[in-house]
């Protein structure tokens, strides 16, 4: 996971790196790159000094086994190589191809880096050959472990790509099948429905012609023997109709109305009892559901009100218990802070005496210089103006450091009285 400290190490943004913790400086991104590796890759010496002084691991590698020395040697950053060698980085570290930083510099034809690493290797071989053999064995062991880790990551990535590729293939095949089936269905349905509609239209035309011919013939035959309409009924003959005929006529009209209203249920061959029974059952179900709702609603409302009342009673009891605890522990309320809100920094790194001394005198920017020369607080108190001049410190910083040393010596010689301070 890439963080802002990775970007600060790449861009040599020193103010942000001074706030980083040991965990932040050793956190790897997707490629296994840490801020230490990025600072060595880009040749940012000041950023590399701050990172290593705040706990950055100079021997941590990426997924390909490259350490900060590998990147500095490959890109020709001699100043970073000299700092890492003096800081104690393993110059015999191996990558996944079992190549050391010296081999990486030789493959890129970085002659100065090759000479610097060769000189450091000869010095370590002459001074402590047992330590050199132990470092080489450890480097080989770490390289084999890193190779297995890299193979596992590659296998996982290949399986993931294969799954995504198979999903894409299945999606394209299904889409092609669906398009083919749709086109086939559309063509067949269009042909069938077109022929059917054409046949239906032809039959309707033929029937309409026949109906017209028959109606015309019937009208002609009927009109030949009919009387005019005005001659059929007269006002004088209206009262002469018998009452039985009128009652029959009225009854026939009512029957026609009943037939028209009951035509939905009275179907020939289906049965009117089935439909009417279903209608009756539907009404009964609706009435039963209404009754159930009518019985359920009040009980649910009473339950909710009771639950709300119980919740309020529980809250009041909890508040009373808290007040009793506060009264019993009277000292807890006297504290000016809340102990639960106090947050402790988990990743805080224990500062060295030299770092504490420089921080107290506002001289923390000179810490990388002393770390590079392996100077601790005791050695710094023994340094003179000439010693500081030999490590290439300028006049202004030398005067500040010397005055701070004098103040410390005076305080140690004449310590003051211990006095309690108020919070």
UniProtKB/Swiss-Prot annotation:
Pfam families assigned: Ank_2, SAM_1
Chain location of the short sequence motif PDZ-binding per the record: 421-423
Bias (Low complexity): 171-181
Keywords of the record: ANK repeat, Cell projection, Coiled coil, Differentiation, Repeat
Tissue specificity as recorded in UniProt: Cochlea, kidney, lung, liver, pancreas, salivary gland and small intestine (at protein level). Expressed in kidney, small intestine, pancreas, liver and colon. Not detected in heart, spleen and brain.
Record-annotated SAM domain positions: 357-409
Region Mediates localization to microvilli, annotated ranges: 1-251
Coiled-coil segments on the chain, per record: 130-169, 301-335
Species of origin: Mus musculus
InterPro entries, per database record: ANKS4B_SAM, Ankyrin_rpt, Ankyrin_rpt-contain_sf, SAM, SAM/pointed_sf
Protein name from the UniProt record: Ankyrin repeat and SAM domain-containing protein 4B
Location, primary (coarse class): other
Gene transcribed to yield this protein: Anks4b
């Amino acid at each position: 996971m890439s963080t802002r400290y990775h970007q600060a190490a790449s861009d040599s943004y020193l103010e942000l790196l001074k706030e980083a913790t040991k965990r932040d400086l050793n956190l790897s991104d997707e490629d296994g790159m840490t801020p230490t590796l990025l600072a060595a890759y880009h040749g940012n010496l000041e950023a590399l000094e701050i990172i290593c002084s705040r706990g950055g691991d100079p021997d941590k590698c990426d997924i390909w086994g490259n350490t900060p020395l590998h990147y500095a040697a490959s890109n020709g950053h001699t100043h970073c190589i000299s700092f890492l060698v003096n800081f104690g980085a393993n110059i015999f570290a191996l990558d996944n191809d079992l190549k050391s930083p010296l081999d990486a510099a030789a493959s890129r034809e970085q002659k100065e880096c090759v000479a610097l690493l060769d000189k450091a290797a000869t010095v370590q071989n002459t001074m402590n050959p047992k330590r050199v053999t132990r470092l080489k064995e450890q480097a080989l062991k770490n390289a084999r472990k890193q190779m297995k880790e890299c193979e596992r990551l590659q296998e996982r990535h290949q399986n993931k790509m294969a799954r995504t590729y198979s999903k894409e293939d299945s999606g394209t095949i299904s889409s092609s099948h669906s398009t083919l089936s749709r086109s086939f269905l559309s063509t067949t349905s269009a042909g069938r429905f077109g022929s059917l509609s054409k046949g239906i239209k032809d039959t309707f035309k033929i029937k309409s012609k026949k109906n017209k011919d028959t109606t015309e013939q019937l009208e002609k035959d009927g009109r030949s023997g009919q009387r005019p309409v005005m001659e059929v009924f007269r006002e004088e003959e209206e009262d002469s109709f018998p009452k039985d005929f009128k009652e029959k006529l009225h009854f026939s009209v009512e029957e026609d109305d009943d037939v028209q209203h009951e035509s939905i249920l009275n179907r020939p061959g289906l049965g009117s009892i089935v439909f009417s029974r279903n209608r009756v059952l539907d009404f009964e179900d609706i009435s039963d559901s209404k009754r159930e709702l009518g019985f359920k609603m009040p009980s649910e409302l009473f339950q909710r009100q009771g639950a709300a009342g119980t919740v309020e009673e529980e809250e009041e009891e909890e508040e009373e218990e808290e007040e009793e605890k506060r009264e019993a522990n009277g000292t807890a309320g006297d504290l000016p802070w809340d102990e639960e809100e106090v947050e402790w920094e988990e990743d805080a790194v224990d500062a060295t005496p030299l770092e504490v001394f420089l921080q107290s005198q506002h001289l923390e920017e000179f810490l990388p210089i002393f770390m590079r020369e392996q100077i601790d607080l005791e050695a710094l108190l023994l340094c003179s103006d000439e010693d500081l001049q030999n490590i290439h410190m300028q006049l202004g910083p030398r005067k500040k450091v010397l005055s701070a040393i004098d103040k410390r010596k005076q305080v140690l010689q004449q310590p003051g009285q211990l006095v309690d301070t108020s919070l």
